[in-house]
Amino acid sequence: MPAPRHARTAQQLPLRPDGTLRLAVVADTHSQPHPQAAEHLAARAPDAILHAGDIGDLGVLDRLSRIAPVHAIRGNIDVHAPELPDVLTLDLVRSAEDPQPLLRLLLVHIGVHGPKLRAEVAAMARAHGAQAVVCGHSHVPFLGRDRGLTIFNPGSIGPRRFHLPIVFGTIDVTPAGLRFAHVDCETGAPWTPP
């Protein structure tokens, strides 16, 4: 698999005045997000939505942006979207006036091989000072650690693949740190592996 073409595009996400932030994380919509995805995403009241690639029809991003601002990258099927970056660095900052990053996330479509980070993704995360890697591609919801980095795959809210659940993720930023979770797109309930 070739390395991502764009070394880095960076964006800032300011925290709320109380030092918190809620991110919804989706991936692999393949033009067909689950019919209840928007309802369950909106119920989580995210400050922003991250899309980890394989968007398909870019109208998906327009619909998601009705819920919250969207930060998206291109996946391997998104050849029609050259305006989207392959990699996005997201700096979580206190405010627009205080742009020093408190935490840095790296958003990349193909980030892992099984439960392990791909070597080039781990090197990129380290080079850019990221503490966590958010990825998609496999449709497998996953939270783990490798090489000192947190790895989070939200799963897929697109068409069901094999026996995999249809889920999205949330990242809650609090003064105590990050809290990751998965949400069942069909029921809106928290999802945990069987």
State where each predicted segment sits.
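Core catalytic region of metal-dependent phosphoesterases/phosphodiesterases
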Residues: P2-P99
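Binuclear metal-dependent phosphoesterase catalytic core
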Residues: P2-R22, T89-P101, H128, F152-P194
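Active-site neighborhood of phospho(di)ester-bond hydrolases with catalytic His/Asp-centered motifs
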Residues: V25-A27, A48-D54, H71-N76, L106-H109, ...
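Residue-level detector of flexible, active-site-proximal loop/helix-junction positions
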Residues: H30, G56, I77, G114, ...
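Short, well-ordered secondary-structure micro-motifs
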Residues: Q36, L61-R63, E83-P85, L117-A119, ...
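Short C-terminal domain-edge/linker segments immediately following a structured domain
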Residues: D54-G59, H80-E83, L107-G111, C135-P141, ...
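Conserved beta-sheet core of the metallophosphoesterase superfamily
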Residues: H71, H113-G177
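Active-site-proximal segments of metal-dependent phosphoesterases and phosphodiesterases across multiple
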Residues: D78-G129, P159-F162
